[in-house]
Amino acid sequence: MKAIKDSAIYLFGELISRSVPFLLLPYLSRKLGVEGFGELSYYQTYLALFLIIVGLSQEGAIARFFYVYGKRALNLVVNAGYAYTLSIGSVILAFCLFFKAEMLAYLALSAIFQSFLAVQLSVRQCQKQAVAYSVIQFLSASLSAGITVFMLEMYQTELVEKRILAILFSNLLVFLFAYLLYRQKTRIKSFNFRQYKTALYYLLGFGLPLIFHNVSLFLRGQLDRIFIYHAFSEAELGLYAMGAQIAAIVMILIQVLNKALVPYFFEGLKQQRITLVQVQRWARYSLLLVPIPALIMWFIPEPFVVWLLGSQFVGTKYYIVLFLIATTLVVPYLILVNYLFYHGQNKSISICSVLTTLIYVISLLGLTLTEIQFVPLASIIGAVSILPVLYWMTAKVGK
């Protein structure tokens, strides 16, 4: 019963906290305008890239360490990870300052504190502190929104920079709050240099192999913004990025449902109540769901979208429709990939990830040479192309 209650708290907290940035979209679209929103989405790609480098999947390493080795030396791994993040983050920061890239320096600092915060959230999740986990998440999202509104109302220029600073300040403040609570509840032990070195090797051993996978996810999720920024105007990127942002609301719902259903899915596979035939049938039937969100969006009048986002965002509806198709294609993907995860086919999943990325990047390169209206098709091509491969792999595993 406690497991169900905790799961409900986690899911509710995640849904609420991840909804806050989307509730902020109409405000940001009006304050930044279409060009400013395009510029912001471009800089956010660097934040995602820096986070991969300084984070090194530490939250996953912390979770594995806790469940495999226990909590006695957990603080050792946490501190070793923080030392790594500070070291690598300082190198990135030094490059930014050397090249006088002030905005990138803010993003590097934000990535450092966001990585710190992700580790704190992982510790709470491992220790089954569902309420604390949800409170920290909600505090991070709401504080970021609050500081953003405050700064954009206080200043009239360099508004993209102010939004980035708001993200930085919220990451810093929430991390300090979470870390102070962590220190109060953690028995501090002294460790020697050799133990810290061992902990660092553990983190590197866990995180480095995942770099390629994370970079693949980055390329599929962020590379298009960089290409569009250099090939088209900031205004066109703004429309494109807004369409992707709104379609991502459906992705949140899919991820929340996936997180809630995976334990029952795995349990059904373990007890053989769920078979490969059923899994593949569900994947096929889920394809019928793919056009539904896009069709609903298609019937929503364009003037309503413009009223919601602002007069500069005429044409955003087109991008929302296309990105909704690409997003909903995640449903059959998750059904098939969860089956492979259960059977420990991580290598097969990695191969699929690399293959999808290659197809996506090639499609993106080709479509970027045409018109921006065709660029979202790269996401659909990448999402569709991987499904037959996953279907074949699940059939191979189920034999």
From Swiss-Prot:
Bilayer topology: Multi-pass membrane protein
Signal sequence, start to end: none
Record flagged with keyword Membrane: yes
Keywords from the named record: Cell membrane, Membrane, Transmembrane, Transmembrane helix
Entry GO CC: plasma membrane
TM helices/strands, residue ranges: 8-28, 36-56, 92-112, 131-151, 164-184, 199-219, 237-257, 288-308, 320-340, 349-369, 374-394
Top-rank taxon, per record: Bacteria
Keyword presence, Transmembrane helix: yes
Localization terms from the record: Cell membrane
Pfam family, one: Polysacc_synt
Family membership noted in the UniProt record: Belongs to the polysaccharide synthase family. HI_0867/HI_1700 subfamily.
Name of the protein in its database record: Uncharacterized membrane protein PM0507
Upper classification of the organism: Bacteria, Pseudomonadati, Pseudomonadota, Gammaproteobacteria, Pasteurellales
